[in-house]
């Protein structure tokens, strides 16, 4: 190109209004569903680091009644809590469906023993209700709310309350 010939400036682009209205943003929460006894429970999926088959457990003398013992996870000691006992349900036997949900409390991994893991569910915030006020409910502080997606019923657990005082 010679000095005298320059390219014209590019055309100026003007923003166009959107043709379609934006859909409303629906806030959702993904939860991991699991079974304790005959009831469905859930924790936020982001709180669960791993799901394990039940490994060998080492009993710890004088541990709390909720604590089954400890286990080793790739060289890290994990305290194992019987979630049934923790929320006041009767103990049940282990079987091939029994799983350990590994969650985190500060810098310490905690294993929560559950009867079975069922599914990951995406809940809309409007499907989540506050915990019901049921007189005489033991361990009500462990309940965060309930959700009824598609006719199912999940009891949402309050993980910080569950892990407190272990």
Residue ranges, per PLM feature:
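An acidic, low-aromatic, low-complexity terminal/linker signal
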Residues: 1-166
């Amino acid at each position: 190109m010679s000095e005298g010939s320059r390219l014209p400036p590019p055309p100026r682009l003007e923003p166009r209004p959107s043709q379609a209205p934006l859909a409303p943003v629906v806030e959702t929460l993904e939860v991991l569903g699991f079974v304790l006894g005959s009831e469905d429970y859930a924790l936020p999926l982001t709180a669960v680091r791993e799901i394990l088959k039940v490994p060998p457990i080492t009993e710890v003398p004088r541990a709390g009644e909720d604590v089954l013992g400890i286990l080793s996870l790739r060289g890290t000691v994990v305290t194992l809590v019987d979630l049934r006992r923790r929320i006041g349900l009767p103990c049940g036997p282990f079987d091939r469906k029994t799983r350990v949900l590994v969650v985190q409390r500060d810098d310490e991994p905690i294993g929560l023993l559950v009867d079975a893991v069922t599914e990951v569910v995406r809940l809309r915030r409007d499907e989540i209700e506050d915990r019901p006020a049921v007189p005489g409910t033991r361990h009500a502080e462990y309940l965060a709310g309930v959700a009824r997606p598609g006719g199912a019923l999940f009891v949402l657990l309050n993980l910080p309350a569950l892990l407190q005082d272990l």
